[in-house]
A protein has these predicted regions:
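Non-catalytic interaction/Regulatory regions outside core domains
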Residues: 1-92
């Protein structure tokens, strides 16, 4: 699985609009990262995804997407089962 994850991270970074990507487990442990998102962001990313899920409680969409917006870009965070993914995109 590790080599597959590494390949997905590398493929994601090929998009010129993406400057960072991070995958964590449910405890915030880093599974892999590239670019502007690093090991130190894992815990925050995991907690944001978990807290957003408790806020929504929508049975039709149990896994909300968190979007942190700034003038320079967005960080999108979403959980997929036991893995949380964050993608840092520059503003277009």
């Amino acid at each position: 699985m590790e080599s597959t994850l590494e390949q997905h991270l590398n493929d994601t970074m090929k998009n010129p609009a993406i400057v960072g990507v991070l995958c964590t487990d449910q405890q915030g442990h880093n599974l892999g990262c590239r670019g502007s998102l690093s090991d130190e962001h894992g815990g925050v990313v995991s907690v944001l995804a978990r807290q957003a899920a408790t806020l929504t409680r929508d049975p039709t969409d149990p896994t909300p997407t968190v979007c942190l917006e700034s003038d320079s870009g967005n960080i999108l965070i979403r959980s997929h089962g036991t893995i949380t993914v964050a993608v840092h995109k520059i503003a277009s």
